[in-house]
Amino acid sequence: MQLGIILKGIGGFYYVKQEKTEDIFECKPRGVFRKNSVTPLPGDRVGFSIIDGDKKLGNIDEILPRSSELVRPAVANVDQIAIIVAAKAPNPDYMLLDKLLITAETRNIRVLICVNKIDLDDDTAKIVRNAYSPAGYDVIEISSVRNIGYKRLKEELKGHITVFAGQSGVGKSTILNHIMESWVMETGSVSNKIERGKHTTRHAELLELKYGGYVADTPGFSSFEIIDIPYNQLERYYPEFLPYINTCRFNSCSHITEPGCRVIEALERSEIDNNRYQRYIQLYKALKDIPQYKGKKTESRRVIK
């Protein structure tokens, strides 16, 4: 059995890079995967058998254990997420950014926040840095026009499987073309009407970096929902809350209205970004209204920490 990594899957075929030779084989998964409702994903490390060495055809026989799995984008074994926001065109969707950060936190995946197109608006980069640096997130400013940020980004990508995610039209493909030092992805303009990218990525695909590691460009999106987190566990995925949540007066503190809330006190001292905090309240209330949690007592947060 040969070992390899899935680079992409299209129409039921999966393109596997062989570990030893680095040849790429077009493979079909064995029927047992469908029978067990298992779908191979880009990033999966697999065992496969060669059917035709000349034509580079094979069958996927085994999917090795995954260290992580993202649903949207559907990529396995990711250990880093680069979330791309644009300084302008389109304007940043901070709620989407927060949801992506929460998704990464639930899976213990490292995050880079990249602010692209800073040549269009320097102030946005400052806003993002001031809001997210206190939470411990790295913020990288990028501009193709000024050729800024790419050297540092390449250093951060070395040795990782990194997924690029963000709104449509923020310039993910343009960034990838720069860090790959060749044209690898079609880039598209942004529709003025809906501020979404045109002619952009349609599927997740791993691209190998010559200096080590892989990156995955993924279809851009304008909406993203988190529904699998109990509302009283949401606090766990805000790193800037963690120093305070165990010291609130009430064990079941929601950090919204309760007296003696250390998170609110930190907010009042400007140690927590107010806009990000307001979005926390929106997400908390939205999760609380989900039918599976509404009217029910969920597990005590004192137990889950």
UniProtKB/Swiss-Prot annotation:
Its EC number is 3.6.1.-. GO terms for molecular function: GTP binding; GTPase activity; metal ion binding; rRNA binding. One of its GO terms (cellular component) is cytoplasm. The keyword rRNA processing does not apply. Its cofactor is Zn(2+). GO terms for biological process: ribosomal small subunit biogenesis. Keywords: Cytoplasm, GTP-binding, Hydrolase, Metal-binding, Nucleotide-binding, Ribosome biogenesis, RNA-binding, rRNA-binding, Zinc. It comes from the Bacteria. Monomer. Associates with 30S ribosomal subunit, binds 16S rRNA. HAMAP family: GTPase_RsgA (MF_01820). One of several proteins that assist in the late maturation steps of the functional core of the 30S ribosomal subunit. Helps release RbfA from mature subunits. May play a role in the assembly of ribosomal proteins into the subunit. Circularly permuted GTPase that catalyzes slow GTP hydrolysis, GTPase activity is stimulated by the 30S ribosomal subunit. This is Small ribosomal subunit biogenesis GTPase RsgA. It comes from Ruminiclostridium cellulolyticum (strain ATCC 35319 / DSM 5812 / JCM 6584 / H10). The gene is rsgA.
